[in-house]
Amino acid sequence: MASPNGFFNHLTYFLAAGAVTLGIGFFALASALWFLICKRREIFQDSKFKAVDEKCRQRPSKAKIKSHPQCVFISRNFHTGRFQSQEEQRKKETACIKANNGYSKDDFCLATKKVICDPSESSSATNPSSVTLSLSTLPSDFYYSQSVEIADDWYSDDSQMKKSPSMPFLGEPLMEKVFSYLTTIPLEQCTENVLNMTLRDDQKDDNLKEIFTQRNTEVEIQNLQHNTE
């Protein structure tokens, strides 16, 4: 017959071994789950990046869209609410390029003179941005540089500077007026005013002190009457 102590010892050994194996199994399962979660995140992120790359590739490049900005008819598309097809845009772009190439330098000079000399367009001549907008029918690289030169000449003209002199600084005449007014006031009058102000303040302080003393005496009299009663 085996002793009960040996049986209990064997039972404890088996229980300890089972607990250790269960702990190892749970640790392995947890590590496997963590590995799967991390892989899933990586796969999900990769799929997102791939989808974004595909969308970016499907979109047309901005350089191709903005190659000829002067030929895009924004007002027509805005009012009608329909976008033109690519073939129609290409045809219009080629027509605009041919028309722009047909302009000569003399036409450009006449257009600039008309813009500057026309009295109805005087407001646009003073503003360089409006000058560039009024000449939008000419080639972009050529008329932009010419309009900038015209604007520089316009603003650097001495006659225009004489016609529109700069406004004087308002702070200096105001300060001069203040100083001149202060110099006209005599010092005796200033000292008299200061003395009068100090006397008035002293009188006010004396009146307040008298009022407080009267109130204190009245309160003391009332307290004495209550105490006697």
Swiss-Prot record:
Keyword Protease set for record: no
GO cellular-component term (any): membrane
TM spans (from-to): 17-37
Matches recorded under InterPro entries: DUF4718
Its membrane topology: Single-pass membrane protein
Subcellular location: Membrane
Record Pfam families: DUF4718 (PF15842)
Predominant place of localization: membrane
Record carries keyword rRNA-binding: no
UniProt keywords, alphabetically: Membrane, Transmembrane, Transmembrane helix
Official protein name in the record: Uncharacterized protein C1orf185 homolog
